[in-house]
Amino acid sequence: LSYSIEWGGTYIKSGYGADTSGIQWADNATFETKINNGSLNLQVQDEYKDYYDKKVEAVKNLLAKAKTDSNKDNVYVNFLSVASGGSAFNSTYNYASNINPEIAKTIKANGKARTGWLIVDYAGYPWPGYDDIVSEIIDSNK
């Protein structure tokens, strides 16, 4: 199986791991790692143990970095998920219902700008009265 991805001017071919040990992934962090034998910089925000304010700040910080970066060798991956305790007020759904609209507003305010890859819980879910994050991501790429 062979594949390739072209996203925002960045081209990744199958078999792009850093080396035989794979992609180095930091736990609960925003970090940079190399892939494609060091030719691509993977910028990742995966602070999943944080609560709303800190998580939204981390997501917005990586969006701002992606927006101002024209280097096609930098790939941005932004996870909007938060680990939850399982209760109704501390659930994945509850976090997504607050984080997704907030980030959708930020993407809309940024206009036509590079966002990188956003990994979203409840993508496309219609939060009443709020902009849809999927539509805003697509519109930012037009």
List the model feature ranges, each with a label.
Residues 1-142:
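Catalytic cores of phosphodiester-bond hydrolases, prominently lipid phosphodiesterases
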